[in-house]
Every structure is written in C-alpha cells, then in structure tokens.
UniProtKB/Swiss-Prot annotation:
Subcellular location as annotated: Cytoplasm
Gene3D superfamilies, A to Z: Alpha-1-antitrypsin, domain 1 (2.30.39.10), Antithrombin, subunit I, domain 2 (3.30.497.10)
Name of the protein in question: Serpin B3
Subunit composition and interactions: Interacts with MAPK8/JNK1.
One Gene Ontology cellular component annotation held by this UniProt entry: vesicle
Gene transcribed to yield this protein: SERPINB3
Length: 390
C-alpha cells in the first residue's frame, strides 16, 4: 500500500467495524476529517505514542520511507504522510463553481504551554492550520464556547455544540478540532415533482413512510452477485465528487453485506473498472442524518492507548512531556435532497428525478443501505455512513 487514501479507507473500515458493535441504526462520520486531525497530533508525537497512532491509522503502510524519526517535521521525502496531507488538503480546498468543500483544522492549547516554533511551522505547512492559545485553566466554559463557535463558522452553522457542556475542565491542556463542510449539486438533479411518499423497510416486519426521490437515467452500476448486493455511483456536478450507494438485494441483507465487507473489497467493488454505464430506475430517500461520537474509547480499543494517559509523549509540540489528549469528539451531518447534498464538521447528503417507462436496472433504496461520498481524483472517502432508520 502506498497512498494516504488507501490508509484512510482501511482506517474508515476499522472504525466502521467498531461502530457496528454498538450502533444498530444510522452511522455517519468523516474518516478523512478524523485522520487529518490525528495526523496533526502525530506530527508532535514521539516514540511509542507515535508508533501507536501510525499503526491505527495505517500510516505505517504508506510508502517505505514514510517516516524517519517519529516526530517528523524535517520531512522532505514526497512519500511522507504529512506531505501527502498537504497535497490532499490543497486539492480539497480548491475553489470551484461545482461544489463547496472545505476542511478546517485547529489546535486549541492551554495558554501556559508554549508550543515549539518548529511544530507551529510544520502544522501550518502541512495542515494549513495554527494553534490557538486559550485559558482552559481559568475559563474552561468560555474556552468551550469559543471552540464551538469556531466549528459552527467553519461548517456553515451545520455543526453546533460539538463539545457538550462538561467536556472541558480546568485541567484540559489540548483540544484538537477538525471541521469538514461539503455542499454539492447532483450532476443530474432529481425532479421534485417525481418525489413521492413511499415505504421504507428498516426490517421485514415494519415500514415507515418517507419522501422518496426518483430518477431514471444512466449511472455507473455493478451487481455484486457474491454478496447479493448492488452498487451505484451518483455523481455531483463536475464529477469530481460522487456518492456511492451499496444496496443489499434483500430487505434484511445489510448485516450479511457488512459481515463480508473488507476495505479491499470496498475499493474493488466501487472502482470504475468494475462498474458499467447502465440505465437505472433510481429511488433514493430524501434524508438527513446527524451523528456524534466521542472516539476516545474506540481509538483506545483499536490500539491508540498512550496518547490519552500519562504515557503520552507529545514533546514534539512543546519540547517537554505533560500534554495529554483528553478526547477526540466528532460530529457529522448529512442531508440529501433533490438538488444534491449538504454535509458538515464531518458530513454528507443526497438527491432524486424523472419517471421511467421501461428500465434496465432497478435501484430502490427502500431498505437499509451503506453510502459514502468520495473525491474521485484522489480516491479519498470524505464521508461514510449507514442509513437504516429514517
């Protein structure tokens, strides 16, 4: 494996397997947003702390010469993971008429800690960000509000109250925030007049009435016989970004699909070589999902242990030990409409169009499915989710 996008997909999949254990309903998160936030921490981590982060994020598999020293600011090799982030973030934050996509990172540090200039220069270079000093010790609640309002401003006010009351105390030393915002229009919009009330079956025994968008047109499509499912790509305007939907053939087929899914299979099934242009009668729910996660326990379970306790070595940030990450909070929002998608602080969205007469393939998302939003040029998964509960 040699690319950041592959490492991101593997990490995304590992996270999903953790979320599956505890969440039966909707799941929605932004793997690239979590990865880039932890990449900033890695830049100041050393020894065991750094090794654990790299292993969990699969950065240890990104090119042979990924990292020399564990705290790597002196990184001139193009294969380096931080260099790849620099390229990726530059690509994502390019302005375009087709869609809005913005990834914003920020570190909020207790003002009594002095951050090394070397570290500040490195996060500015690679992650286009800075450290903001705040008074956690004397004004924790004020600091929390300040961080939340920054997140809100970066996500078009879609992500509010990222850090709930009580999550920041006077002993907090470092809060790492990543916000991602996406708003796109479909390449082919859905006609609102075709949106009708239809049944959505969370399981075989119950249904809910939902607004179902419809469109009959050509899409990239593949039938996955071995897992009894099918996959469809719905491009956004400009085709730089797409929403990919994985739909089980049976109403209750999602669990089986999730059990057979691997990161490698996901990449293989959804690659354009394996899909063909097909006329499809698409039924896609108009939906909105918002999910919040405190990733501390999840990341610990995955092997990132030291960073959350006294063994943390973040001396690459300040020159001495003592900084400990108190938590990793993540919130994601997605809304899917006829026009397209709006997504934030880790977020994604969808839409639908005109009535078919005869059709080659049916793709009726009237039961639980998986979906993700991908940046096609870099093959990076921005958002990943499961929709099973309207």
């Amino acid at each position: 494996m040699n690319s950041l996008s592959e490492a991101n997909t593997k990490f995304m999949f590992d996270l999903f397997q953790q979320f599956r254990k505890s969440k039966e309903n909707n799941i929605f998160y932004s793997p690239i947003s979590i990865t880039s936030a932890l990449g900033m921490v890695l830049l100041g981590a050393k020894d065991n702390t750094a090794q654990q982060i790299k292993k969990v994020l699969h950065f240890d598999q990104v090119t042979e010469n990924t990292t020399g020293k564990a705290a790597t600011y002196h990184v001139d090799r193009s294969g380096n993971v931080h260099h790849q982030f620099q390229k990726l973030l530059t690509e994502f934050n390019k302005s375009t008429d087709a869609y809005e996509l913005k990834i914003a990172n920020k570190l909020f540090g207790e003002k009594t800690y002095l951050f090394l200039q070397e570290y500040l220069d490195a996060i500015k270079k690679f992650y286009q960000t800075s450290v903001e000093s705040v008074d956690f010790a004397n004004a924790p609640e004020e600091s929390r509000k300040k961080i939340n309002s920054w997140v809100e401003s970066q996500t078009n006010e879609k992500i509010k109250n990222l850090i709930p009351e009580g999550n920041i105390g006077s002993n907090t030393t470092l809060v790492l925030v990543n916000a991602i915002y996406f708003k796109g229009q479909w390449e082919k919009k859905f006609n609102k007049e075709d949106t009708k009330e239809e049944k959505f079956w969370p399981n075989k025994n119950t249904y809910k009435s939902i607004q179902m968008m419809r469109q009959y047109t050509s899409f990239h499509f593949a039938s996955l016989e071995d897992v009894q499912a099918k996959v469809l790509e719905i491009p956004y305007k400009g085709k730089d970004l797409s929403m990919i939907v994985l739909l089980p053939n049976e109403i209750d087929g999602l669990q089986k699909l999730e059990e057979k899914l691997t990161a490698e299979k996901l990449m293989e099934w959804t690659s354009l070589q394996n899909m063909r242009e097909t006329r499809v009668d698409l039924h896609l729910p108009r939906f909105k999902v918002e999910e919040s996660y405190d990733l501390k326990d999840t990341l610990r379970t995955m092997g990132m242990v030291d960073i959350f306790n006294g063994d943390a070595d973040l001396s690459g940030m300040t020159g001495s030990r003592g900084l400990v990450l108190s938590g990793v909070l993540h919130k994601a929002f997605v809304e899917v409409t006829e026009e397209g998608a709006e997504a934030a602080a880790a977020t994604a969205v969808v839409g639908f169009g005109s009535s078919p007469t005869s059709t080659n393939e049916e793709f009726h998302c009237n039961h639980p499915f998986l979906f993700f939003i991908r940046q096609n040029k870099t093959n990076s998964i921005l958002f990943y989710g499961r929709f099973s509960s309207p």
